[in-house]
Amino acid sequence: MSKVKSITRESWILSTFPEWGSWLNEEIEQEQVAPGTFAMWWLGCTGIWLKSEGGTNVCVDFWCGTGKQSHGNPLMKQGHQMQRMAGVKKLQPNLRTPPFVLDPFAIRQIDAVLATHDHNDHIDVNVAAAVMQNCADDVPFIGPKTCVDLWIGWGVPKERCIVVKPGDVVKVKDIEIHALDAFDRTALITLPADQKAAGVLPDGMDDRAVNYLFKTPGGSLYHSGDSHYSNYYAKHGNEHQIDVALGSYGENPRGITDKMTSADMLRMGEALNAKVVIPFHHDIWSNFQAAPQEIRVQWEMKKDRLKYGFKPFIWQVGGKFTWPLDKDNFEYHYPRGFDDCFTIEPDLPFKSFL
C-alpha cells in the first residue's frame, strides 16, 4: 500500500505527539544532581519538575491539556471566572502556545505529585492516570482540598491523597514541602455557573489554593502557583530562606487582572528576599503573551537605586535550571550541541569548503 493511502490523521498524531517524545523524561532520569544543588525543569505554564541531590523527584502543576481549538462556540462559558471578572460575553481566545515537552505516560520515577489549585491548567487527569498506572503504588498526591476532591473523583484512592493547607509540612524523602498562603483572587470567583459572586463574601482561600516552599538539602524553591502580588510575600520572606522564586507573569488583557506584571515580579522578588526570581505562566496562553525581558529592563533601571538582592532569570519551556550553578545567569538557551566538532575528520571536498 502506498504511504499516502496508509497514513491517517491518527497515525500522524501518534508519530508526532508529544512533540518532544521521551527526550525530557530521559534527561531527568539520567540527571545526577550534585551535592549542594537542586535541579528543576519547566514543563510549561506553572508546571515544574524538581529533583534533589538525593534523587527525589516531585512534580508540581504538571498539566497536559490544551486551550481553544475551534471557533464553533463564539461565547464564553456561562459563569466563567473571566466573565465574572470583566463582564464579558465573547469567547476567550486562549490557545496553548508551547509544545508538550514531557510525556506523562513515560514517567517511571516520581515521589510525589502536587498541585497548587484546581484550575484546569494546573491539575491534570492524564498525569494522575499515568502515575497510577506506571509508577510505584505509594506515590502521594498532595494539594489543597479542592485538588484532592478532583483526584479522588478521577479515581485516585483517598489514602494516596494528602490535603494541605497553609502551615502544613510534608516530608518526601530529602525534600521538605511547606504549604503557604496563596493569593489567587481569581480562584475565589471560580464558582458553579448558577452561583453568584456579587455581594457575597468569598469562601476561604485555604481550601482552594496554596503556595509551596520546597526545602532541599541544596537550596529552596518558592512556587507561587497562580498567586497575584500580595504584601504577604514579605511575611513569607521574613519567615523562610528563599533561594529561587517562581511567579505567574503575563500581559493582562484590557479589563483583566489575572497575572503579575513586570513591576509585580520585582516586588515579589524583593519581598521574598529571594536570590533569583523567575517568571512563568506567560508561555502558555496566546492572549496573555508577554515579553519577560521587560522584567530585566526594569530590574536594570532599579537594581542599584533600590539595592536589589536578587536577579531575574528568563527561562524556556523544557529547559533546566540548577541552583546555585545558574544563579548568575540572566537567560536560558537550549543546548546548542556540536561541542564535539572536529573529533573526527570532516568529509569535505577541500578545507576551505565551509
UniProtKB/Swiss-Prot annotation:
Keywords: Cytoplasm, Hydrolase. One of its GO terms (biological process) is L-ascorbic acid catabolic process. Its EC number is 3.1.1.-. SUPFAM superfamilies: Metallo-hydrolase/oxidoreductase. It comes from the Bacteria. It is found in: Cytoplasm. InterPro entries: L-ascorbate_6P_UlaG, Metallo-B-lactamas, RibonucZ/Hydroxyglut_hydro, UlaG-like_MBL-fold, UPF0173_UPF0282_UlaG_hydrolase. CDD domains: UlaG-like_MBL-fold. One of its GO terms (molecular function) is L-ascorbate 6-phosphate lactonase activity. One of its GO terms (cellular component) is cytoplasm. Its main location: cytoplasm. Pathway: Cofactor degradation; L-ascorbate degradation; D-xylulose 5-phosphate from L-ascorbate: step 1/4. Induction: Induced by L-ascorbate. Repressed by UlaR. Its cofactor is a divalent metal cation. Disulfide bonds: none annotated. It catalyses: L-ascorbate 6-phosphate + H2O = 3-dehydro-L-gulonate 6-phosphate. HAMAP family: UlaG. Belongs to the UlaG family. Probably catalyzes the hydrolysis of L-ascorbate-6-P into 3-keto-L-gulonate-6-P. Is essential for L-ascorbate utilization under anaerobic conditions. This is Probable L-ascorbate-6-phosphate lactonase UlaG. It comes from Shigella boydii serotype 4 (strain Sb227).
